[in-house]
């Protein structure tokens, strides 16, 4: 992964590294309402939402996607690059498991 688009580097204090080995990287994400994060990349991921989350993703081509998660919802995605904004009224709190080897 290009370090200039590494979520942990771009996300600043929003991301906290919980575990990393040669197969996975486990991150905790906490974004306050209105918070924005610059363009960054993820390999394939599984994410768990601790609470309600409402976010807008901006893709490299400028298109936007609104993402709404419920408490306890789990999502999976292949590799992607995006910028993020918490458009909700509550903190976005996710456990993000990045898969290094599939």
What are these regions (language model features)?
Residues 1-13, 101-102:
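Basic/polar N-terminal segments that are highly enriched at the extreme N-terminus
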Residues 11-36, 43-47, 97:
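A short glycine-rich, His/Asp/Glu-containing loop-to-beta-strand
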Residues 34-37, 75-85:
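Histidine-centered metal-chelating micro-motifs
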Residues 36-37, 53-58, 74:
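Short beta-strand segments in beta-sandwich/barrel cores
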Residues 42-61:
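Glycine- and acidic-residue-biased ligand/ion/polar-headgroup-sensing regions
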Residues 61-79:
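Short acidic-glycine-tyrosine-enriched beta hairpin
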Residues 79-102:
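Ligand-binding loop in jelly-roll beta-barrel domains
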